[in-house]
Amino acid sequence: MARLSRERYAQLYGPTTGDRIRLADTDLLVEITEDRCGGPGLAGDEAVFGGGKVLRESMGQGRVTRAEGAPDTVITGAVIIDYWGIIKADIGIRDGRIVAIGKAGNPNIMSGIHPDLVVGPSTEIIGGNGRIVTAGAIDCHVHLICPQVIAEALGSGITTIIGGGTGPAEGSKSTTVTPGGWHLARMLEALDSWPVNIALLGKGNTVNPDALWEQLRGGASGFKLHEDWGSSPAAIDACLTVADAAGVQVALHSDTLNEMGFVEDTLAAIAGRSIHTYHTEGAGGGHAPDIITVAAHPNVLPSSTNPTRPHTVNTLDEHLDMLMVCHHLNPRIPEDLAFAESRIRPSTIAAEDLLHDIGAISMIGSDSQAMGRVGEVVMRTWQTAHVMKQRRGALEGDPSGRYSADNNRARRYVAKYTICPAVAHGLDHEVGSVEVGKLADLVLWEPAFFGVRPHAVVKGGAIAWAAMGDANASIPTPQPVLPRPMFGASPAVAAATSVHFVAAQSIEAGLADQIAVDRRLVPVADVRAVGKADMPLNDAQPRIEVDPDTFTVRIDGEVWEQQPATELPMAQRYFLF
């Protein structure tokens, strides 16, 4: 019996079990561990669309109607990279949700077809063969300073935004907060027409519980405590007390100046309760110099932001000016300058690299336009993984060798911007992974451009953003090929395929009838019992110590030496600027 070579099979149908794929121009490789949609022994039976190919009437396409269960869309032959594994499969989408991950086609003439992947006349096909699919990214730290930030986010593969703001107001430029019911209503209305899921954070800096409850009834999904509004132990305790009663998450940017207490006082105020600590490395803010030690605690869900990812020879130089602008500081005031300089510590930034690699810092966000870049969350995550592989070699459980697969490292790092923030904020019943039942928020990548620019962004089953050529060309591919909004980004479709995540109290208060939005309001799940152990593949709790004089960081007793990277992948090979 004639058999295809692995090379030829990959050319025709995409890679299969045992094949390895390089991610962009990094040193990272992933290996397909399972092929649910074919394989070399089944060549010719794979679901492939095109002239003379399988998915034609009475061949790979059957007669089943949509009413009889045919999926609306099938993504064929995609390599899925998710926290739970790296496999190849066809992905079925129906009513904007993932309904099956397996083998698609016509069971009348094909074997092994998943019952929810029977292709019919009502089924659209997205070619995933030779491409990678990941869950839509979740940016857990977004300042909503301008609406254009949403387009940048979508163009990088982000489909869910957690954060706050009201536009270019001083409060929003410094803090990820949408304060009060009026602002929450206006922002929910403003964001209704964008194809992204939204979870707004209300202002948590108060000791008045009534002011917190009214924000939950007004559409907040949780709270943000920020030092620029005063993150005192009393405010932390009051906010967490209401959060415990409401079941929502609290994000904390703690007191850099240690005016209201030290890191020990903040931990005492938290009192073992679940909390998401922003800027856990400290460069973006938080108790100087030892906020990074909170990553060792079982109740703390730590994240850091992308301007310090990874530590390079340029990281320190760009941070001082960023800090002065973002926190409304005056370089002519010595105290303001000292405040800025106290936060930029190369030793803790370097330690951030290692803590991400061992899974001790669980999440990465952008801090968009407030010391971070919303379009670089995905890219800088994988740059960090690359740098750590170069420095530390294979991760535990991965084989060693130049061309060995890095599946465990890939799964850990993809989790940092997908499932981990979803779990932390109570969104994982809807988003955060490529799993049956969840919203079909999916990103397709050409392997050579993985993490750099998506091939297409599917939002709730509709293509919302894609790499597209000249619209006046005779075919879709002529230059310039740019990330462009697609029909799924039109306001009516965006509202139909996206959700606003809100506290359950706003649903009970009838918020949907009080604001002008067309999308569903979805209550966040109760997160008050969520701890570090619930962060998939990112649950490490090492002992972390910071010398108060030298800022030297010890992790499990070992000093992590600074070796800032001098060259990165996913950079000038892809971008002119």
From Swiss-Prot:
EC number: 3.5.1.5
Main localization (coarse): cytoplasm
Binding site for substrate: 226
Active site, UniProt feature: 327 (proton donor)
All residue ranges annotated as the Urease domain in the record: 136-577
A Pfam family the protein falls into: Amidohydro_1
GO annotation terms (biological process): urea catabolic process
A single GO molecular function term of this UniProt record: nickel cation binding
Annotated residues for binding of Ni(2+) 2: 224, 253, 279
Cofactors: Ni cation
Signal sequence range: none
Keywords: Cytoplasm, Hydrolase, Metal-binding, Nickel
Catalytic reactions on record: urea + 2 H2O + H(+) = hydrogencarbonate + 2 NH4(+)
Residues the record lists as N6-carboxylysine modifications: 224
Pathway info: Nitrogen metabolism; urea degradation; CO(2) and NH(3) from urea (urease route): step 1/1
Binding site for Ni(2+) 1: 141, 143, 224, 367
First-tier enzyme category under EC: hydrolase
Subunit details: Heterotrimer of UreA (gamma), UreB (beta) and UreC (alpha) subunits. Three heterotrimers associate to form the active enzyme.
HAMAP family assigned to the protein according to its UniProt record, in alphabetical order: Urease_alpha (MF_01953)
NCBIfam families, per database record: PRK13206.1, PRK13207.1, urease_alph
Annotated family: Belongs to the metallo-dependent hydrolases superfamily. Urease alpha subunit family.
Protein name: Urease subunit alpha
Name of the gene: ureC
